[in-house]
Amino acid sequence: MSTVYVVGLGPGAGEQMTVRAEKILEACPVILGYTVYIDLVREQYPEKKFLSTPMKQEVKRCQMAFEEAVKGQDVAMVCSGDAGVYGMAGLIYEVGREYPEIKIEIIPGITAATGGAAVLGAPLMHDFAVISLSDLLTPWEQIEERLEAAAKAGFVICLYNCLLYT
């Protein structure tokens, strides 16, 4: 049985990738992901088969991963940060319903929120909120409500996808 691994690469620097992520990338003959994330690992694994798609083709990317796995190959789907925090883990599980013969395994990584907090010297020691500013899947009005509620409650707020709004 082939496996699709969803691998969190961490917040961008190679040394922030987990040992488990490195082992999975080393073991899988196929590495697939968003073009920018593939560029982060291509040089380190030159013998691998690389497949990529641009932004906004996440479903297609997941389908490609399963199509490769159906051929009998283990596949590493790479994401930035942690695969389960604004990553591809949820979508892989959704698309994976169509491929019950393929195993799915999530390989967590260091989130951008915790990585950024460490760089800034601002550890997330108490309750905090993580909110994406992307309105691709969430209406902007709902994002605003979440921001207001988190601020009113006194949470430290870690924002994702800020570049969309600068």
Question: Predicted segment positions?
Answer:
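Ordered, small/hydrophobic-rich secondary-structure cores
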Residues: 155-157
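Conserved small/polar residues in nucleotide/adenosyl-binding loops
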Residues: 165-166
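Class I SAM-dependent methyltransferase SAM-binding "motif I" and its flanking Rossmann-like core
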Residues: 85-153
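Class I S-adenosyl-L-methionine
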Residues: 1-104, 115
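Internal catalytic or translocation cores that form aromatic/hydrophobic pockets or channels
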Residues: 160-161
